[in-house]
């Protein structure tokens, strides 16, 4: 994950995974001093003062940049932690939903098996009840009893 940061007039790209170490162990105040390989002549005191002021300004910008970069890195770390927490919650919720779906599917399968078993039995029972009702009605029908006795 890379981000752009502006510190004064310096625009830098910082890799946030390595950025914290780079910022914390980066340039020190002595890193901007003049090296011994410069020519043996020294600039005039006025020029030297201007250079020192510029170096001090750059060092302030560097410190400001370090603070901003560390703040941005901490913010990104916090955001990442929050996103990880939310992701874990969503994964748990998805697992619960999948479990409920499996349970519903299992109940549906059982329900279908029960219905497959009971529906033909219900039809048989209805037919049997109908026959019994018809027999009962015939046995209690007085006209039928009279006709039966006349036939004898």
Curated annotation (Swiss-Prot):
Organism superkingdom: Eukaryota
Signal peptide range: none
Stored Pfam families: DUF4715 (PF15835)
GO BP annotations listed: female gonad development
Keywords associated with the record: Coiled coil
Disulphide bridges, residue numbers: none
Chain segments annotated as coiled-coil in the UniProt record: 46-109
Protein name as catalogued: Coiled-coil domain-containing protein 182
Protein source organism: Mus musculus
Primary gene name: Ccdc182
